Every structure is written in structure tokens, then in C-alpha cells.
């Protein structure tokens, strides 16, 4: 189910069986594969790809801009594998153009803030 109050960019690609909660934000160029659950108030930022069966809990942010003072809007990415859990208030950032431009997370992980 996709809640009526969430915001989904028109360029996002979301599998039919994904659940997206109230006030969640799905940004441009986001891909969310089957079985994912995006809870209320979670944020998935641009150029982020989520594999299958991931859960993003409330107030977590995935694919935010890098926390790097040299970052100036370059096209960077965040790639998430399958079966991960991102608990409340967790933040995962995209790579930087000066280093590795793609943050890659594998499968079967638990992230907590």
C-alpha cells in the first residue's frame, strides 16, 4: 500500500508490492525493488537503489548528500542490496566524487542510530 500523503517523484521506479507509509519522501531516480517497506516519515533521496525486502523505519534517511565539505552537487549514488533493516533515525549517505561516488551496502544488514 502506498499512503496518500507520501511524496513520490515521477522518475522513481517502485515495485507493485512495496509499502510506503504516511509522509514518506521518495526522491528522483530512486528504484525500490519488491518486498520493501518504507515506514512513515522515512526519506529515500535521489539516485538511490534499494534491492528486495528492505525495511526503512520512521525518520531514517537513505541516500542523502555526502557529509563532505568538498561536495558540490556532483552526481553520486547509493546502492542497497537485499534484506536490510535501517532503524529509526539512521542515515546513509551517497558517495563523494573525490572518493568512491557510490555508497554500496550488501545484503542482510542491520543499521541503527
Predicted stretch roles:
Residues 6, 12, 18-20, 24, ...:
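A structural motif detector for beta-strand N-caps
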Residues 1-4:
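Extreme N-terminal starter segment of soluble prokaryotic enzymes
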Amino acid at each position: 500500500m502506498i499512503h496518500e500523503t507520501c511524496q513520490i517523484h515521477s522518475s522513481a521506479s517502485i515495485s507493485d508490492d512495496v509499502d510506503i507509509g504516511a509522509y514518506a519522501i521518495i526522491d528522483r531516480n530512486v528504484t525500490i525493488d519488491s518486498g520493501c517497506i518504507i515506514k512513515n516519515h522515512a526519506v529515500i533521496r535521489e539516485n538511490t537503489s534499494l534491492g528486495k525486502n528492505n525495511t526503512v523505519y520512521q525518520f531514517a534517511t537513505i541516500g542523502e548528500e555526502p557529509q563532505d565539505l568538498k561536495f558540490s552537487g556532483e552526481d553520486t549514488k547509493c546502492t542497497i542490496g537485499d534484506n536490510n533493516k535501517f532503524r529509526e533515525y539512521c542515515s546513509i549517505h551517497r558517495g563523494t566524487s573525490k572518493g568512491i561516488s557510490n555508497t554500496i551496502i550488501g545484503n542482510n544488514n542491520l543499521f541503527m542510530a
